Amino acid sequence: MSDIKVSVIIPVYNGGQAFKKCLYDVMNQTLKDIEIICVDDGSTDESAQIISQAALEDSRIQYVYQNNQGAAVARNKGMEYATGEYVSFLDADDFYEAEMLEKAYINSVKHDVDICIFRGNKYDASSHQYLSMDYALRFHEIPCNPFTYKDISDNVFHFCVGWAWDKLYRRQFIIDEKLSFQNLRTSNDLFFVFSSLVKAKKIYALNELLIHHRVNDSLSLSVTREKSWNCFYLAANALKQELERIGKYHEVEKSFVNWYVHFSFWNLDTIEGDAYKKVYELIKYEILPSLHLEQYPAGFLSTNYVKRVFDVQSYDCDEYVYEQFFKLRKKAKQKSDDGAKRIKNSKTYKVGKIVLFIPLHIKKWLKRRKK
C-alpha cells in the first residue's frame, strides 16, 4: 500500500494569482502525507512558473504538462500519476481550510467509504463576500450517515451538486469502476460525480465547511457557457445511458427525471445571448420528449416544474419569453404594491405623517395669511 494518503489533482489553465493561493493552501494542509499533481493544460501565463517555484519549496509537487485539452482530460491525466489511498480533484481558483484534507481523510478511513462529501461556501471575487451554499449538500435529505444511493434513491441527484471538488474519492474505487471525466468544455464532472454516487458501496457526508468556491471570476469557463451551451445535455444523456447500462436507472428514475428537468431549466435561466433560444429548443424538442413525462403518475414530477414544462410544451421561444416577461412584471408590481401597503401601515410611516403634518399645516396657514 502507498504511503501517500491523498493524491491532490489540480488542473490549471492560466490560473494566475488565484491558482497560487490554491496551490499554497494545499501545500499548507495539516495532512502532510499527500502528493500534489498539477496538470498544466497549456497555460500561457505565469502558471508554469508558479508550479516550478512551489516545487522548489515542496518536493511533494509534481508538474505535468499537456497541450490545451480542457480540465476533464487534465484530471484524467492526473489520475495516471496518482498513487494515494484517496484522491481529491480541486479547481485551481478555489481555496481551502487548512484541515480540509485531514478531516476528509480521517472520516473516510473511519467510516470505510468510497466517497466523502463536505461543505463549502461561495467567495464572490467581485464583492469579496462569502455567501452560503447550503444547496450543495442538503443534510436534511440524508436519512442515515454513512449511506448508499439506495437510502436516498428518490434524491440521489438532488442532495448534492454534481461537481468533484467538495468530495474525496477512494482511488481503488475509481480504478475498479473505470470512472473518468467526460471531455466536455463545461459540465465535464457531472457524469463522473453522479455515476460514482450510484456505484459507491458507501458514502459519508461531513458536516464541516472546508472549501471556498470562487465565483464571478472573469477567467472562469462557467461565465462563458454560451460557447458550450449543449454540454449539460451531452453530460446528462451519458449519465442516463450509464445508469441503464448498469441496470440501476429504474431505481433512481424519479430522482433523475426531476433533476434533469430542474437542471435543464437552470441552464436556460442562466444562459444569455443567442444560446438562449438554442437551449430552449433543445429542452422543447429533445429533452422533454425523451423523458416521456406523460407516462408518470400525478406527483412524480415536482410541482415546481409542472407549469414550466406545460409552458415550454405549449409555446415557441418568443411566446415563452413574452409570457415569462409579463409574469415577472406582474410579480414585481405585486411586490411593489405589497411593499407600499406595508410601508403605509407601518408605525414609522404613521409617525412620519404626524410629524410632517404640523409643518405642512403651518406652511399652508402662512400662505393663506400672505394672500
Q: Where are the model-predicted features located?
A:
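N-proximal low-complexity "stem/linker" segments adjacent to membrane-targeting elements
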Residues: 1-27
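Cell-envelope/extracellular polymer assembly enzymes that use nucleotide-activated donors
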Residues: 4-7, 35, 191
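A conserved acidic beta->alpha catalytic loop
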Residues: 40-50, 68-70
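Glycine-rich, basic loop-to-helix element that forms the pyrophosphate-binding segment
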Residues: 66-82
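Donor-binding/catalytic cores of nucleotide-activated saccharide
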Residues: 71, 92-207, 213-229
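Short aromatic/hydrophobic "clamp" motif used to bind/position activated sugar donors
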Residues: 87
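Catalytic core of nucleotide-sugar-dependent glycosyltransferases
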Residues: 208-217, 222-251, 266, 270-293
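Boundary detector for helix-to-coil junctions that initiate low-complexity/charged tails
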Residues: 310-371
